[in-house]
């Protein structure tokens, strides 16, 4: 698996981000969706990666810098054709390693509280993320859970 920085201009990644946003809208009320669109993902504080096997897109993930010691996991998504193949594990490990390389002391994330997000919550727990309260600009929301990992 080749995980590389992505400029978000290729048709495959545009389609996957569209699938990601559509999935969020099916499982969460609009006011509780914190997924970023393509324009937002291109902001300077976000590094975005895509995972490939030869010419096939497997998944994606991003790291947002909140401040010099705190990062946020964003836009974790596995292609529906590659679920349960370890793609998300590889991408999350890559993000954690990059956060450590940058010297972050804390890595946080927001994900959904509904059943559809249970696999994501389990993955984050396996990687040592613990439940916490809202961070950065987030507010309490019954459709969101917040997790953090000390690095």
Please provide the spans of the model-predicted regions.
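Short hydrophobic/aromatic beta-strand or adjacent loop that forms the aromatic wall/cage
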Residues: 46, 142-146
């Amino acid at each position: 698996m080749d995980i590389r920085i992505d400029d978000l201009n290729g048709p495959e990644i545009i389609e996957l981000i569209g699938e990601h946003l559509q999935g969020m809208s099916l499982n969460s009320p609009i006011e509780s969706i914190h997924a970023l669109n393509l324009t937002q993902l291109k902001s300077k504080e976000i590094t975005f990666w895509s995972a490939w096997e030869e010419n096939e897109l497997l998944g994606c993930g991003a790291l947002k810098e909140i401040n010099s010691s705190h990062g946020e996991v964003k836009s974790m998504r596995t292609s529906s054709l590659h679920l349960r193949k370890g793609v998300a594990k590889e991408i999350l490990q890559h993000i954690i390693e990059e956060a450590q390389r940058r010297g972050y002391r804390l890595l946080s994330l927001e994900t959904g509280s509904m059943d559809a997000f249970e696999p994501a919550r389990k993955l984050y727990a396996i990687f040592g993320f613990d439940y916490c309260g809202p961070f950065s600009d987030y507010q309490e929301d019954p459709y969101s859970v917040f997790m953090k990992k000390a690095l």
